């Protein structure tokens, strides 16, 4: 597993290992302290453009359920796609077990081109964010050739890792990005 870093706007760096898509991305770094519901949280439009830190120590242990539903409503998700820019966890579990699971968290993130970092002390990071407030951050992958350091979400495709700026999602029209195009 390649090494990765979360670099905060204040210069702080947190090192870990990649999972999901191996690419660079940036966004506002926020945290969630929930014990369950990572698929719902990751697809929640209110997290659009953000790098999400999950404080529960083991994420991915129940996998990701099927995304099918009825009448264009998803039974296990909050929207039709992952909304976050990246995911930061203490430990990403590859061996999942749940009757409704269809795939691992890492596989799902790869399908949606979302990078993640595991092996980070998410509770220390959360304390920093709680005392300093949310900050802009970026995920960069060590050891990948520059041409492979593409952005983690379609809004950032083609950005070279070391050149990824601290993107503030609040400067964009997020409502337009998450709204349905037609009824």
Model-derived segments and spans:
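RNA-binding accessory domains that recognize and position tRNA/RNA substrates
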Residues: 1-183
């Amino acid at each position: 597993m390649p090494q990765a870093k979360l670099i905060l706007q204040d210069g702080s760096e947190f090192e870990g290992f990649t999972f999901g898509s191996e690419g660079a991305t940036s966004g506002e770094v926020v945290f969630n302290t929930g014990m369950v519901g990572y698929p719902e949280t990751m697809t929640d439009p209110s997290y659009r453009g953000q790098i999400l830190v999950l404080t529960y120590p083991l994420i991915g242990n129940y996998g990701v359920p099927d995304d099918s539903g009825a009448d264009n409503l998803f039974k296990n998700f909050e929207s039709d796609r992952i909304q976050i820019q990246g995911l930061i966890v203490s430990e990403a579990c590859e061996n999942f077990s749940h009757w409704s699971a269809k795939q691992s968290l890492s596989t799902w993130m790869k399908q949606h081109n979302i990078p993640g970092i595991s092996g980070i002390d998410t509770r220390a990071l959360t304390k920093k964010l709680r005392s300093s407030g949310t900050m802009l951050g970026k995920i960069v992958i060590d050891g990948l050739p520059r041409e492979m350091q593409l952005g983690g979400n379609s809004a950032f495709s083609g950005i070279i890792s070391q050149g990824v700026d601290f993107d503030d999602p609040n400067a964009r029209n997020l409502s337009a990005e998450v709204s349905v195009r037609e009824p």
